[in-house]
Amino acid sequence: GAGEGEIARFVASWLQRMGVEVVWDEPVPGRPSVVGIVRGSGGGRSLLLNAHMDTVGVTGMQRPHEPLIEGTRLYGRGAYDMKAGLAAIMLAAAEAKKMTLRGDVILTAVADEEYASIGTQSIIKRWRADAAIVTEPTALQLCVAHKGFLWFEIVTRGTAAHGSRPDLGRDAIVKMGHVLLGLERLNQELQARPPHYLLGHGSLHASLIQGGQELSSYPERCTLQVERRTIPGETPEQVEAEVRDLLEQLHAADATFEATVRTTLQRAPFEVVPDAEIVQTVRRHATLDDAPEIVGNAAWMDAALLTAAGIPTVVFGPGGAGAHAVVEWSDLQQLKKCSAVLVNTLREFCA
């Protein structure tokens, strides 16, 4: 798309007006992230606040970039995923500027979470913190785990020939049919394994398939894109081995079966223990009548990258609905509550 330049400039300008130190981080041209720093007096713990600025497409939406408020709901593309969470950390950073803290507050408004996460990946190379809060939408619940994923490309090989010459042709699409049946069996095996206590089971599905050139020819190539969703404890090596084993079994049963597999993208799952200090600190300040629930999320978030970098992380953000949907909205009351919880959390954690 157009990149994050315009929204990044807005975030940077707003933070500067609030007196927050701003660093511009642009590892890829046109995909900037903004870091806002409220420096403490020294000797305290630092807290990183993370939200992404990018959104998905707007096909089918009516006036997606014109904000509409009805009651406590703000409608528009990105309102839920995740401009509300971004607004919450901006407000919290502005409040932090008014406090006397020993530790630093580091706001990271990042690019590209929806695809390759180049924003957060660049941030963790340059910045460290004692804990982090990602304000993806959780309806003010505490998310301590989410799934990871791997994307595979499987290619089966055939022999091109005229459709009238079955003695010469070998059908790559038919060969891929055996792969699809094998993947279905593998997915059934995944459902029979012990589930994660918050996330359930891992899963896989065939996402895209392409093969053949014309009706009167045997296809020499068929390509399948597969997504495998992983749970904590499942490693990329284990997942890749399962797919390779399937292809080897198919070759053992049919010497004419030829296939290759490669991983095109992988992201680890995320998990933090519920009694981690950052989780419990947020929980204390988020407790009104009842303590917020400890939950998991099936989607992937940048929390996994922060945790892998050694930063204990929890996901806590305002509610709403419609991520990646035609109708998207965020709850403005929950946005205010989220920001207040962040302010009280950083006041304690960075004291």
Predicted regions: what they are:
Residues 50-51, 108-110, 133-136, 155-157, ...:
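Short beta-strand segments
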Residues 1-77, 98-101, 284:
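Acidic/His- and Gly-rich active-site-bordering loop/insert found
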Residues 45-48, 72-73, 105-106, 130-133, ...:
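Structural motif
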Residues 2, 23-28, 153-351:
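Metal-dependent amide/peptide-bond hydrolase catalytic core
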Residues 82-151, 350-351:
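Acidic/histidine-rich catalytic neighborhood of metal-dependent amide-processing enzymes
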Residues 72-88, 162:
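Glycine/serine-rich anion-binding loops at beta->alpha junctions
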Residues 54-70, 144-155, 281, 314:
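Acidic-glycine-rich active-site phosphate/pyrophosphate-binding loop
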